[in-house]
Amino acid sequence: MNAKELIARRIAMELHDGDIVNLGIGLPTQVVNYLPDNVNITLQSENGFLGLTAFDPENANSNLVNAGGQPCGIKKGGSTFDSAFSFALIRGGHVDACVLGGLEVDQEANLANWMVPGKMVPGMGGAMDLVTGAKKVIIGMEHCAKSGSSKILKKCTLPLTASKKVAMVVTELAVFNFIEGRLVLKEHAPHVDLETIKAKTEADFIVADDFKEMQISQKGLEL
């Protein structure tokens, strides 16, 4: 199991039956693959859909694409609307959770996930609205950058997407929650010890009294 799959499997355990959820592009889209059988969520997309499903080549519709431009479907009872209504849903607090990738998260619950200096980017898209309007903001990302440096920092160095909005960070090493303004280490991945997490995390954090091993979705792993 690779790092991204582990992260997606853990985040899948965080969603609840009946939730309206927005999944960012990249790693977050994998979360739906690992939802427990008793959890049914409704996917919302910034470009005007409620009730997105996976792409079905037998019932393809060129008008159905998600916010990342990827082909998709829409479930029975799903709805379509313009972007103004879509963002009204988001800004109005009707999205239960959003799952986004991250470039940096710091100990003050700040998120940077849209710009890398020196690279051309189109802008942050709907992420700015999602992190402000969603009831819970979950960041799924690898713990360290390709250079080996920590992505969980004392202070973000990249331009921020949002300030003090992150509720939870899931990496291949650990799960952190922001509780009363403090970064709290709640879980460790299997075969990962506390010292490893400390060595790979720049941010200051406290260890939860109930610090435990991460539990992940077993969907597809059953023999």
Curated annotation (Swiss-Prot):
Pathway: Lipid metabolism; short-chain fatty acid metabolism. It catalyses: an acyl-CoA + acetate = a carboxylate + acetyl-CoA; acetoacetate + acetyl-CoA = acetoacetyl-CoA + acetate. PROSITE patterns: COA_TRANSF_2. Pfam families: CoA_trans. One of its GO terms (molecular function) is acetate CoA-transferase activity. One of its GO terms (biological process) is short-chain fatty acid metabolic process. Its EC number is 2.8.3.8. Keywords: Fatty acid metabolism, Lipid metabolism, Transferase. Belongs to the 3-oxoacid CoA-transferase subunit B family. Heterotetramer composed of two alpha subunits (AtoD) and two beta subunits (AtoA). This is Acetate CoA-transferase subunit beta. The lineage of its organism: Bacteria, Pseudomonadati, Pseudomonadota, Gammaproteobacteria, Pasteurellales. The gene is atoA.
